């Protein structure tokens, strides 16, 4: 009789790939090498559908036409993955072969970090829009923390780049949520630091510059806020040949008026 598992598995695809269930953990050192790591990550990400074997091969080897007997090699990788998952209560059906496809199935309630980050971001942004900052910090912090970790470090490929781009977007938006919460709580230096993180990651994202300018001004640093505006304007002109948006210009105009009023 098999072990009775009390918890659904947790799958970490960022950082070091790790699977946890109850008190049992399997990390990527148990996966069948670099190719096994790529195959597992791809099958987890695409588990909502059967994935054609040639698509899995492309994800594993990064080429549409792997050399040699690639179908045999891929079958061996999948067999080793099944063996790796067995200590966590997965049977051979966890990665099923059907009609020229592979499909990975996780038990009900399984938690996958990349997906959890997206859900947490949606929750945080909803709280920010509804002006519930106290409820936004937790999920925004979860999203930012997960999205900051590397995905398949040392590997590359179109699908890997897409996942990384999604994580980067999640992190940037989560940092914006955290900055909004900090501003709402009157923690203006923290809000400015978080907004600076946003513009460092995405320098053409004007909402980040706007948050930075407002946070600096609200913290009593109007000159620094105008300096941030000048930095934004110079970047836009040099790299894109455009001026900042009317909203950004409006914030700068308000800051100039406030500075003029204070010196009158």
Summary of predicted features, one role per range:
Residues 19, 40, 56, 81, ...:
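Conserved RecA-like P-loop NTPase ATPase core
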Residues 48-60:
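Short coil-to-helix segment of the ABC ATPase nucleotide-binding domain corresponding to the Q-loop/switch region
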Residues 74-82:
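Non-catalytic DNA-binding core/recognition domains of DNA-processing enzymes
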Residues 1-37, 92-103:
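Short boundary/linker motifs that mark transitions into or out of structured domains
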Residues 85:
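Glycine-centered, phosphate/nucleic-acid-interacting loop/turn motifs that mediate DNA/RNA or nucleotide
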Residues 26-30, 34, 42-48, 65-72, ...:
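Intrinsically disordered, charged and Pro/Gly-enriched terminal/linker segments
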């Amino acid at each position: 009789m098999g072990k009775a598992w009390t918890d659904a598995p947790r799958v970490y695809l960022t950082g070091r790939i790790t699977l946890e269930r109850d008190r049992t953990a399997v990390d990527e050192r148990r996966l069948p090498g670099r190719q096994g790591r790529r195959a597992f990550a791809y099958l987890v990400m695409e588990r909502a559908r059967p994935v054609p074997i040639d698509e899995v091969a492309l994800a594993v080897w990064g080429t549409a036409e792997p050399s040699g007997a690639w179908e045999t090699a891929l079958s061996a990788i999948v067999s080793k993955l099944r063996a790796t998952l067995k200590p966590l209560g997965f049977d051979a059906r966890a990665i099923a072969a059907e009609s020229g496809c592979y499909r990975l199935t996780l038990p009900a309630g399984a938690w996958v970090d990349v997906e959890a980050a997206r859900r947490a971001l949606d929750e945080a942004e909803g709280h920010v829009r509804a002006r519930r900052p106290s409820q936004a910090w937790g999920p925004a912090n979860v999203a930012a923390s997960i999205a900051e970790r590397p995905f398949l470090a040392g590997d590359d490929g179109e699908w890997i780049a897409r996942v990384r781009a999604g994580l980067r977007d999640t992190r940037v938006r989560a940092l914006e949520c955290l900055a909004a919460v900090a501003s709402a709580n009157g923690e203006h230096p923290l809000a400015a630091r978080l907004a600076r993180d946003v513009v460092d990651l995405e320098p053409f994202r004007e909402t980040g510059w706007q948050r930075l300018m407002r946070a600096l001004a609200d913290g009593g640093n109007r000159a620094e806020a105008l300096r941030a505006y000048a930095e934004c304007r110079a970047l836009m002109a040099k790299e894109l040949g455009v001026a900042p948006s009317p909203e950004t210009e409006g914030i700068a105009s308000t800051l100039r008026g406030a500075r003029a009023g204070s010196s009158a």
